[in-house]
Amino acid sequence: MAETLNPRAGIGMTSARTRGRMVERLREQGIKDEMVLAAMGMVPRHLYVDQALESRAYEDTALPIGFGQTISNPYIVARMAELARHGENGKGQTLGRVLEIGLGCGYQAAVLGKLAREVVSIERIAALVGKTRARLRELRVNNVKPKHGDGMNGARDFAPFDAIVLAAAFAEVPQALLAQLADGGRLVMPLGNATQTLCLIERQGEAFVEQRLEGVKFVPLLPGVA
């Protein structure tokens, strides 16, 4: 498997058994989609965090990844992936092309890559794009395309998308992203500033149906590039 490429992969506490315990915890927390649970079990989270934080990789907590950014906790990654595939109560959808806003360390993109044919991921911080691109290449994650750019603009050249997942919060839904959703597609994002709510928007022709779900806490979505 891909993790054998990295000398950090053989450490006992970062083994497949540890990921299995994480998956069982996700199941207990209410994640039902077996494909999402399988994806979470396959992606080695400890290889997406700094070595100093490796011992905490499978805790259900967000961790810093540098540049003022964080890797989301496993539950929220699984929850957003499940919403991207199902909506709140729907049947699981096979995903073709997915847009992620906020590449970060690449972990969520790698999970989405297990569920979709292709993932395009936008990151505003150039140094983070370079670091994560190298990591994904090392781990042979070949269907994730990291792009440096302003996430507010999405990725028009690759649209339409079956799902759009935002890994950062914004006060309102970026209209440019809604325009890039395929008919029947879903946008999942943390909505708000100080108080944030996980928001699901489904496109039905020219209409958009919005649901506001549980409270969450994400770093803010910033415009421009760095």
UniProtKB/Swiss-Prot annotation:
Keywords, in A-Z order: Cytoplasm, Methyltransferase, S-adenosyl-L-methionine, Transferase
This protein's record includes keyword Cytoplasm: yes
EC number: 2.1.1.77
Keyword match S-adenosyl-L-methionine: yes
One annotated GO biological process: methylation
Major site of localization recorded for this protein: cytoplasm
Enzyme's top EC category: transferase
Active site: 72
Molecular function terms, GO-annotated: protein-L-isoaspartate (D-aspartate) O-methyltransferase activity
Cell location: Cytoplasm
Cellular compartments per GO CC: cytoplasm
CDD domains: AdoMet_MTases
Record field: catalytic activity: [protein]-L-isoaspartate + S-adenosyl-L-methionine = [protein]-L-isoaspartate alpha-methyl ester + S-adenosyl-L-homocysteine
Main function: Catalyzes the methyl esterification of L-isoaspartyl residues in peptides and proteins that result from spontaneous decomposition of normal L-aspartyl and L-asparaginyl residues. It plays a role in the repair and/or degradation of damaged proteins.
Family affiliation: Belongs to the methyltransferase superfamily. L-isoaspartyl/D-aspartyl protein methyltransferase family.
Protein name: Protein-L-isoaspartate O-methyltransferase
Source species of the chain: Thiobacillus denitrificans (strain ATCC 25259 / T1)
